[in-house]
A protein has these predicted regions:
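Catalytic or ion-coupling anion/metal-binding cores of large enzyme and transporter domains
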Residues: 1-25, 29-31, 36-57, 62-63, ...
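A short, small-residue-rich loop immediately preceding and capping a beta-strand
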Residues: 87-109, 121-124
Length: 534
């Protein structure tokens, strides 16, 4: 049958390379991947391989944000991994190269590569360029925050529309150190993506040559018989954690690296993230909390510069193998720094002495919750709970002006099982920021956050409410305390009272249609374990 698609006897003698594409024209993050796949194909042929391309799904977080469609986002990560794994097993590919763009396509593809354990690599499609409004660079983050600003009367609808029209000027993933760029930088540091390949922006003319080089490289991996799990070791994944926290990356990095570790047969826990973040300095001044976007990082020197700085400080393990055949130290030894760049600081002069993520525990999160600390200085917050059973209810309260300084916004029933799908709460967190409340309130949820979220916002609360987690015990007015020095989040309530309230709580009735979401709800594990399906 392969003759019928154009292959010859000569092609059958060559390594068969699967090109796993996540192209779609329904999001700018992936709209250009068809062209990149063509360049990859040329590279595979250059190196003496036979390419076979196939496609899988891509659900855009940005487009589904704040809607019921966001329930499908994290679910899509598992389906991406499953579908690539099945194609790899079914076609017996000798090697696989996966092309990714929007948030879940990046970890989903790498999870599949870990399962298959074939010679393989992941190529990220690159970041979008920033838009421009009123003489300043803007990103999709500005749009979501402008919604809150408009609701609060700080801008009018005409300016909101202008910001929305300007924020996304072309192909590529959201431009700050949000989830997509976080995971792309992480996987360069881990070694499953070639160093320097991901930060090249989507619309840069050099991207096609990067893709062609990756096509040649995957054939070389086959010839060297270097498989994914030889690269995805515990030490390499710890390097990825260090780069995530040193760049102020997304809390989603926790979910996704735990999931990749699971698929690679590596033990990685929330405690590892907390330990590494506490010991690793924050070096990169990146949005959503900082000044710069991914193309700025690329011009400054890229992930190689970040990794070199961390290696110089003793924060990375330099002898880890990468897909190029070099060690991490070898990859970054000649990293070039653009004179005068202000994006990446030295380890001796960091932005902060500790990295950008923190794990909190306590009687509201016995199995942990995750907080991004890169963008704020508050180490303590105590205030009354404002409890909501869904993101929509919380959004109504924010837009209605009923959330006041000091409040702790609690959104539950949004975990992996409870959602189902563990929606991102960016609509709410951005509305709080846009209305001027971002630095005056705190938020606690068993859902998760966009990489564009910043402020005292703790998510991934485990156990989640529908699993009997103590977050289900909270009622309006309960005093919730965040103590970041002690790494705790708690409520002043006895264990017996918490247990009694949890037993009395029942989630709001929601009809989950038979299909992917109900299947996911039955199979998904805790956020503390990466929300993988088992």
């Amino acid at each position: 049958m392969l003759r019928a698609v154009g292959l010859s006897d000569e092609d059958f003698e060559k390594p068969l390379i699967g090109i796993a594409n996540t192209w779609t024209d329904s999001t700018p993050c992936n709209v250009h991947l068809r062209d990149l796949a063509s360049a990859v194909r040329r590279g595979v042929i250059d190196a003496g391989g036979t390419p076979l391309e196939f496609n899988t799904i891509a659900v855009s977080d940005g487009i589904t944000m704040g809607t019921s469609g966001m329930r499908t986002s994290l679910v899509s990560r598992e389906i991406i991994a499953d579908s690539i794994e099945l194609m790899g097993l079914g076609y017996h590919f000798d090697g696989v190269i996966a092309l990714s763009g929007c948030d879940k396509t990046i970890p989903g593809t790498v999870m599949a590569l870990a399962r298959l354990d074939r010679p393989s690599l992941m190529l990220y499609g690159g970041s979008i360029q920033p838009g421009t409004h009123a003489g300043r660079d803007i990103t999709i983050q500005d749009v979501f925050e402008a919604v809150g600003a408009c609701a609060a009367g700080r801008i009018d609808e005409e300016e909101l529309l202008e910001i929305e029209k300007a924020a996304c000027p072309g192909a590529g993933a959201c431009g700050g150190q949000f989830t997509a760029n976080t995971m792309a930088t992480v996987f360069e540091a881990v070694g499953i993506s070639p160093m320097g390949s991901g930060t090249v922006p989507a619309t840069d003319l050099a991207k096609a040559e990067v893709a062609r080089g990756c096509g040649r490289l995957v054939v070389d991996l086959v010839e060297r018989n270097v498989t994914a799990r030889q690269i995805l070791t515990r030490e390499a994944l710890e390097n990825g954690v260090a780069v995530a926290v040193a760049t102020g990356g997304s809390t989603n990095a926790v979910l996704h690296l735990l999931a990749v570790a699971h698929e690679a047969g590596v033990r990685l826990t929330l405690d590892d993230f907390d330990r590494i973040s506490a010991a690793t300095p924050l070096l990169a001044d990146m949005k959503p909390w900082g000044r710069f976007v991914a193309p700025d990082l690329h011009r400054a020197g890229g992930v190689a510069l970040v990794a070199r700085r961390l290696l110089e400080g003793g924060y990375l393990k330099g002898d880890m193998l990468t897909v190029t055949g070099q060690t991490l130290s070898g990859e970054v030894s000649d990293a070039e720094e653009t004179a005068g760049q202000e994006v990446v600081r030295s380890a001796a002069d960091p932005i902060k002495d500790r990295g950008g993520l923190m794990v909190l525990r306590g009687n509201l999160a016995p199995d942990g919750c995750v907080l991004k600390v890169a963008g704020h200085e508050r180490m303590f917050h105590q205030g009354p709970a404002r409890v909501f059973e869904s993101e929509e209810d919380a959004m109504t309260a924010v837009q209605g002006g009923t959330i006041v300084p000091g409040d702790v916004v609690v959104i539950r029933g949004e975990g992996p099982r409870g959602g189902p799908g563990m929606r991102e709460m960016l609509a709410v967190t951005a509305a709080l920021a846009g209305s001027g409340l971002g630095s005056k309130v705190a938020l606690l949820t068993d859902g998760r956050f966009s990489g564009a979220t910043h402020g005292l916002m703790a998510g991934h609360v485990a156990p989640e409410a529908v699993e009997g987690g103590p977050i289900a015990a909270l009622q309006d007015g309960d005093i919730v305390t965040f103590d970041l020095e002690e790494r705790t989040v708690s409520v002043d309530m006895s264990p017996d009272e918490i247990k009694s309230r949890v037993m009395a709580w029942s989630p709001p009735s929601s009809l989950i249609p038979d299909g992917a979401l109900s299947k996911y709800a039955r199979l998904v594990s805790s956020a503390a374990n990466g929300a993988v399906t088992i």
